[in-house]
Amino acid sequence: MLTGQNGILNRASEAKEKTEIASKDEQRKLAQAEALMNTGKTTYKGLILPEGFAPTKIEGEDSIDDGLVITDGYGNEYVWVEVPRTSEVYPTATVNITEFNNDAYINIENDLHTYTSLYRNNTSYTDTYAEDDTSGWFKDESEYNEAKQKMLKSVYENEGFWVGRYEAGISELRGGAGEITAIPVSKENMYPYTYVTRTQAEVLAEKVESGSCTSSLMFGVQWDLVLKYIENKKEEKIPEISKRLNEDSEYIGNYWNSKIKLNRGKYVEYKAGILGNLWNDYTTDIKGCVENQQKVNTEGTGIFITTGASESTNLQNIYDMAGNVWEWTIENSEMNQEKCVYRGGAFDSYSRNRPVSFRYYLPNNHLYYSVGFRVAIY
């Protein structure tokens, strides 16, 4: 029998897949070793890499069109988000700014808002300072604006920025509020780093090693730029990609109504508004929840997954932007006492109501099991 489940062809296919995985693992280890030796900034394919990073050079991860991946010496991976410095993107700011004064920054920001207008959805939310007396937040408007202008200048000059390939992760599951001493990682098969407030997430993001570059939560415009980059690179292969990003993210994220396939990692069942406490290997079946590594679309039932557990959520080598956990940004909702903003929906969200472009506002003390974050480097 050649084509049966235990047939020669199936075994050959499985062997080939295992060989390819092993080969990629070896390439990752080599890239990590190279990263440890890169004590200064390096250049690769026209991009400036932070100190301590190297490209993985793995097929499918080695071009801006696919999503170029870099790693540090410990396996933390980031993806380049291209923002071309062209007259189409910067019609007002222009492409040859020599003096970065206040007017220049205003023009850059406004042009980027126009460039990403589909994903702003006429929002009134802005990247402006919101007062917060929580320890670790920007002390005043001047400090916030300085950080924003640093980001805008870097995006303009370098034509993009690095974003965490994965949601910020942690090796041991957080079961509630508590100390946040563990530095977040950007690796697959980690528990999403949840039960953190917006300010706690920013403090953690700033602690991530990024050489002489800056690590931070994303500003609102950066989140929109990630979506625009995905749209630009995917629109030929997925003509409806902008609708999936902006109207209904069912097929690109982990929502309760999604039917994602699990490829690795672990999951925990969410049913009737209750999150379970038993994390299962991705190959484990739970009737009406996950069967044959496929999430079953049962109303009111979902799964919370470890980082990068499903290729269904992979867009340009960036995992889980849509669904799984909400992700804090440092945008301002302008909503009285609820000025903190998170994006993208979660495993307990409905995809049409909470697509990846969706914004929502919360108070500065909000933390929850379905709220996490992602780190950007620029």
Stretch-by-stretch model annotation:
Residues A322-E331:
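Active-site-proximal beta-strands of protease catalytic cores
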Residues V196, V203, T214, T307, ...:
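Disulfide-stabilized, aromatic/cysteine-rich ligand-recognition loop
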Residues Y74-G75, D103-D320:
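Short aromatic-cysteine micro-motif
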Residues P84-E88, E167-I170, I330-N336, F347-D348, ...:
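Acidic glycine-/aspartate-rich tracts in secreted/extracellular proteins
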Residues M1-S13:
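C-terminal juxtamembrane segment of a hydrophobic transmembrane alpha-helix
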Residues G40-P91, S215:
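GGW-centered surface loops in extracellular recognition modules
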Residues T3-N6, A22-K41, E231-E236:
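Alpha-helix exit/C-cap motif
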Residues S87-N96, I170-G176, N336-E338, Y350-N353:
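Short, solvent-exposed loop/turn elements at domain surfaces
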